Amino acid sequence: MTAATTSQPAFSPDQVSVIFVLGGPGAGKGTQCEKLVKDYSFVHLSAGDLLRAEQGRAGSQYGELIKNCIKEGQIVPQEITLALLRNAISDNVKANKHKFLIDGFPRKMDQAISFERDIVESKFILFFDCPEDIMLERLLERGKTSGRSDDNIESIKKRFNTFKETSMPVIEYFETKSKVVRVRCDRSVEDVYKDVQDAIRDSL
């Protein structure tokens, strides 16, 4: 990218629709995203999945760094996550897909600002609001079968703290711009999805 184009986002909001999907670990983001992909033809990009894939990619210069961050419940440097997201959006746009759910991102203020400045402005944040005790129960249950290294009680508590300290300020910032839809997630998947569908219909 040349110096002359650094202030221009890579995509126009008329060309690409991005909805950020945030919520604490175990809030049910993945389940709801799967339903939206099926019913509304969204492309679901999970920042965590992109990072895990990069971590396992042979010859990745970032693999070890990503592995350590995930293990410690820390946030991966934003340059890596932004590059992976940008490449994934670009590949899908080339395939004529223009609607994206970005799950688990932005997790910090600087990520939010950099994404909207360099890639594309988001439509809104879909925030899955769930009590910690329910999220903990779901994650420990998932950990029995998921094989994920971070589905253990120590990693989960670190992830809860990271979410509260770094992601809640992002949600509060977007609330000042009237760009947050809060959905209560201490209910059945079907009840949550009804509210999610209402939000999608109102926005697109």
From Swiss-Prot:
Domain comment as written in the entry: Consists of three domains, a large central CORE domain and two small peripheral domains, NMPbind and LID, which undergo movements during catalysis. The LID domain closes over the site of phosphoryl transfer upon ATP binding. Assembling and dissambling the active center during each catalytic cycle provides an effective means to prevent ATP hydrolysis.
Ranges for region LID: 141-151
Region feature (NMP): 46-76
Coiled-coil positions: none
Cofactor, how bound (note): Binds 1 Mg(2+) ion per monomer.
Misc remark: Present with 1500 molecules/cell in log phase SD medium.
A GO BP entry: UDP biosynthetic process
pH dependency: Optimum pH is 6-9.5.
Keywords for this protein: ATP-binding, Cytoplasm, Kinase, Nucleotide-binding, Nucleus, Pyrimidine biosynthesis, Transferase
Catalytic activity: UMP + ATP = UDP + ADP
Obligatory cofactor(s): Mg(2+)
Molecular-function GO terms, alphabetical: (d)CMP kinase activity; adenylate kinase activity; ATP binding; UMP kinase activity; UMP/dUMP kinase activity
Cell location: Cytoplasm; Nucleus
Protein name: Uridylate kinase
Source organism phylogeny: Eukaryota, Fungi, Dikarya, Ascomycota, Saccharomycotina
